[in-house]
Design a protein with these regions (language model features):
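N-terminal secretion-targeting helices of virulence/extracellular proteins
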Residues: 1-179, 187, 204
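Hydrophobic, gly/ala-rich membrane-insertion helices/peptides used by toxins and envelope proteins
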Residues: 185-213
Protein backbone atom coordinates (compact mmCIF):
# COMPACT_ATOMS: atom_id res chain seq x y z
CA UNK A 1 0.00 0.00 0.00
CA UNK A 2 1.38 3.41 -0.97
CA UNK A 3 2.34 5.66 1.90
CA UNK A 4 0.92 9.06 0.97
CA UNK A 5 3.25 11.78 2.24
CA UNK A 6 3.05 15.59 2.35
CA UNK A 7 5.17 17.75 0.11
CA UNK A 8 8.88 17.19 0.60
CA UNK A 9 11.06 20.26 -0.04
CA UNK A 10 14.12 18.04 -0.50
CA UNK A 11 12.64 16.32 -3.56
CA UNK A 12 11.28 19.39 -5.34
CA UNK A 13 13.36 19.52 -8.56
CA UNK A 14 15.92 22.31 -8.70
CA UNK A 15 17.96 23.48 -11.66
CA UNK A 16 21.53 22.26 -11.22
CA UNK A 17 22.97 23.92 -14.30
CA UNK A 18 24.38 27.41 -14.81
CA UNK A 19 22.28 29.70 -16.98
CA UNK A 20 24.94 32.42 -16.91
CA UNK A 21 27.52 29.97 -18.25
CA UNK A 22 25.02 28.78 -20.85
CA UNK A 23 24.49 32.38 -21.94
CA UNK A 24 28.25 32.75 -22.39
CA UNK A 25 28.25 29.58 -24.50
CA UNK A 26 25.35 30.95 -26.54
CA UNK A 27 27.31 34.14 -27.19
CA UNK A 28 30.35 32.09 -28.19
CA UNK A 29 28.24 30.13 -30.69
CA UNK A 30 26.93 33.38 -32.16
CA UNK A 31 30.49 34.69 -32.48
CA UNK A 32 31.61 31.43 -34.10
CA UNK A 33 28.80 31.76 -36.62
CA UNK A 34 30.10 35.17 -37.63
CA UNK A 35 33.62 33.80 -37.92
CA UNK A 36 32.50 31.00 -40.23
CA UNK A 37 30.45 33.38 -42.34
CA UNK A 38 33.29 35.87 -42.71
CA UNK A 39 35.85 33.15 -43.45
CA UNK A 40 33.77 31.71 -46.28
CA UNK A 41 33.07 35.13 -47.71
CA UNK A 42 36.75 36.10 -47.53
CA UNK A 43 37.90 32.94 -49.29
CA UNK A 44 35.53 33.65 -52.14
CA UNK A 45 36.16 37.39 -52.42
CA UNK A 46 39.94 37.06 -52.24
CA UNK A 47 39.97 34.34 -54.86
CA UNK A 48 37.70 36.41 -57.10
CA UNK A 49 40.23 39.22 -56.78
CA UNK A 50 42.71 37.14 -58.76
CA UNK A 51 40.47 37.36 -61.82
CA UNK A 52 42.07 40.70 -62.69
CA UNK A 53 45.38 38.92 -63.18
CA UNK A 54 44.27 35.70 -64.81
CA UNK A 55 42.69 35.28 -68.20
CA UNK A 56 42.03 31.92 -69.81
CA UNK A 57 39.15 30.01 -71.42
CA UNK A 58 38.51 28.14 -68.16
CA UNK A 59 38.71 31.29 -65.99
CA UNK A 60 34.96 31.57 -65.35
CA UNK A 61 34.78 27.93 -64.30
CA UNK A 62 37.86 28.27 -62.13
CA UNK A 63 36.66 31.35 -60.28
CA UNK A 64 33.26 29.76 -59.68
CA UNK A 65 34.86 27.04 -57.58
CA UNK A 66 34.89 29.13 -54.41
CA UNK A 67 31.21 30.05 -54.56
CA UNK A 68 30.21 26.83 -52.70
CA UNK A 69 32.64 27.77 -49.92
CA UNK A 70 30.74 30.99 -49.32
CA UNK A 71 27.34 29.31 -49.69
CA UNK A 72 28.17 26.44 -47.35
CA UNK A 73 29.74 28.79 -44.81
CA UNK A 74 26.60 30.92 -44.83
CA UNK A 75 24.43 27.83 -44.35
CA UNK A 76 26.49 26.54 -41.44
CA UNK A 77 26.56 30.00 -39.86
CA UNK A 78 22.77 30.18 -40.19
CA UNK A 79 22.49 26.82 -38.38
CA UNK A 80 24.75 28.01 -35.58
CA UNK A 81 22.82 31.26 -35.22
CA UNK A 82 19.52 29.37 -35.08
CA UNK A 83 20.88 27.13 -32.33
CA UNK A 84 22.16 30.16 -30.42
CA UNK A 85 18.78 31.87 -30.73
CA UNK A 86 17.04 28.75 -29.39
CA UNK A 87 19.41 28.69 -26.42
CA UNK A 88 18.86 32.39 -25.76
CA UNK A 89 15.09 31.97 -25.75
CA UNK A 90 15.42 28.98 -23.44
CA UNK A 91 17.55 30.97 -21.01
CA UNK A 92 14.98 33.78 -20.95
CA UNK A 93 12.13 31.33 -20.37
CA UNK A 94 13.98 29.22 -17.80
CA UNK A 95 15.18 31.97 -15.46
CA UNK A 96 11.80 32.77 -13.84
CA UNK A 97 10.96 29.06 -13.59
CA UNK A 98 14.24 28.35 -11.80
CA UNK A 99 13.46 31.19 -9.38
CA UNK A 100 9.93 29.88 -8.90
CA UNK A 101 11.17 26.39 -8.00
CA UNK A 102 13.50 27.89 -5.38
CA UNK A 103 10.60 29.92 -3.99
CA UNK A 104 8.39 26.84 -3.81
CA UNK A 105 11.12 24.87 -2.06
CA UNK A 106 11.30 27.61 0.58
CA UNK A 107 7.52 27.58 1.00
CA UNK A 108 7.51 23.80 1.28
CA UNK A 109 10.24 23.99 3.92
CA UNK A 110 8.14 26.44 5.93
CA UNK A 111 5.10 24.20 5.57
CA UNK A 112 7.06 21.15 6.70
CA UNK A 113 8.09 23.06 9.81
CA UNK A 114 4.47 23.98 10.45
CA UNK A 115 3.27 20.36 10.50
CA UNK A 116 6.37 18.83 12.08
CA UNK A 117 5.52 16.96 15.27
CA UNK A 118 1.77 17.26 14.68
CA UNK A 119 0.44 13.73 14.28
CA UNK A 120 -3.04 15.04 13.50
CA UNK A 121 -2.26 17.83 11.03
CA UNK A 122 -4.28 16.03 8.36
CA UNK A 123 -7.40 16.81 10.41
CA UNK A 124 -6.88 20.48 9.49
CA UNK A 125 -8.52 21.24 6.15
CA UNK A 126 -6.52 24.45 5.71
CA UNK A 127 -3.24 22.57 6.02
CA UNK A 128 -4.45 19.92 3.58
CA UNK A 129 -5.33 22.69 1.11
CA UNK A 130 -1.93 24.31 1.61
CA UNK A 131 -0.17 21.01 0.93
CA UNK A 132 -2.19 20.34 -2.20
CA UNK A 133 -1.77 23.89 -3.47
CA UNK A 134 2.00 23.54 -3.09
CA UNK A 135 1.91 20.23 -4.97
CA UNK A 136 -0.05 21.87 -7.81
CA UNK A 137 2.31 24.85 -7.90
CA UNK A 138 5.34 22.55 -8.15
CA UNK A 139 3.58 20.57 -10.88
CA UNK A 140 3.03 23.77 -12.86
CA UNK A 141 6.65 24.92 -12.47
CA UNK A 142 8.19 21.54 -13.27
CA UNK A 143 5.98 21.03 -16.32
CA UNK A 144 6.78 24.56 -17.52
CA UNK A 145 10.49 23.79 -17.24
CA UNK A 146 10.07 20.56 -19.20
CA UNK A 147 8.12 22.48 -21.85
CA UNK A 148 10.92 25.05 -22.12
CA UNK A 149 13.46 22.26 -22.54
CA UNK A 150 11.34 20.58 -25.23
CA UNK A 151 10.84 23.84 -27.11
CA UNK A 152 14.57 24.57 -27.16
CA UNK A 153 15.51 21.01 -28.06
CA UNK A 154 12.95 20.88 -30.86
CA UNK A 155 14.26 24.07 -32.47
CA UNK A 156 17.74 22.56 -32.52
CA UNK A 157 16.56 19.08 -33.53
CA UNK A 158 14.69 20.60 -36.49
CA UNK A 159 18.02 21.84 -37.85
CA UNK A 160 19.08 18.26 -38.53
CA UNK A 161 15.58 16.91 -39.25
CA UNK A 162 15.23 14.94 -36.01
CA UNK A 163 11.68 14.20 -34.81
CA UNK A 164 10.33 16.60 -32.19
CA UNK A 165 10.06 15.77 -28.52
CA UNK A 166 6.55 15.63 -27.06
CA UNK A 167 5.15 15.50 -23.55
CA UNK A 168 4.75 11.98 -22.19
CA UNK A 169 1.10 10.95 -22.23
CA UNK A 170 1.76 7.95 -20.02
CA UNK A 171 2.67 5.62 -22.85
CA UNK A 172 6.41 6.44 -22.51
CA UNK A 173 6.81 6.33 -26.29
CA UNK A 174 9.80 7.34 -28.34
CA UNK A 175 10.82 11.01 -28.23
CA UNK A 176 8.66 11.73 -25.18
CA UNK A 177 10.09 13.95 -22.47
CA UNK A 178 8.44 15.41 -19.40
CA UNK A 179 4.76 15.69 -18.54
CA UNK A 180 2.05 18.31 -18.77
CA UNK A 181 0.92 20.01 -15.58
CA UNK A 182 -2.65 18.81 -15.92
CA UNK A 183 -1.45 15.22 -16.12
CA UNK A 184 0.71 15.64 -13.02
CA UNK A 185 -2.30 17.03 -11.19
CA UNK A 186 -4.18 13.79 -11.84
CA UNK A 187 -1.55 11.77 -9.97
CA UNK A 188 -1.92 11.48 -6.21
CA UNK A 189 1.67 10.51 -5.51
CA UNK A 190 4.63 12.31 -7.05
CA UNK A 191 8.35 12.41 -6.22
CA UNK A 192 7.84 15.69 -4.33
CA UNK A 193 4.79 14.57 -2.33
CA UNK A 194 1.18 13.47 -2.40
CA UNK A 195 -2.15 15.18 -2.80
CA UNK A 196 -3.99 14.42 0.43
CA UNK A 197 -7.50 14.53 1.84
CA UNK A 198 -8.58 15.79 5.21
CA UNK A 199 -8.98 13.02 7.77
CA UNK A 200 -11.93 12.89 10.15
CA UNK A 201 -11.87 11.24 13.52
CA UNK A 202 -14.66 9.34 15.23
CA UNK A 203 -15.92 12.23 17.36
CA UNK A 204 -16.54 14.53 14.37
CA UNK A 205 -20.24 13.68 14.42
CA UNK A 206 -21.22 16.46 12.03
CA UNK A 207 -18.97 15.11 9.28
CA UNK A 208 -20.13 11.52 9.62
CA UNK A 209 -23.81 12.50 9.70
CA UNK A 210 -23.41 14.57 6.51
CA UNK A 211 -21.59 11.71 4.77
CA UNK A 212 -24.62 9.48 5.19
CA UNK A 213 -27.29 12.06 4.30
Amino acid sequence: MTDHVPINPCTIPQFTGDLDALEQDKNAITAAAGTFRDAGSNVDSEFQGLSAFYSAPEAAQLFATTKPVKTDSDFFADQLESAATALGEYITEARPIVARLKELQAKATAFSGKISGDAHWKDDGDKIDENNDLIHDVNAAVSAFWAAERTCANKIRALYCAPPLTADDGSHGANMYGYKGEDLNKAQDLPWGSQLEETHRAWEIGYWVKSFV
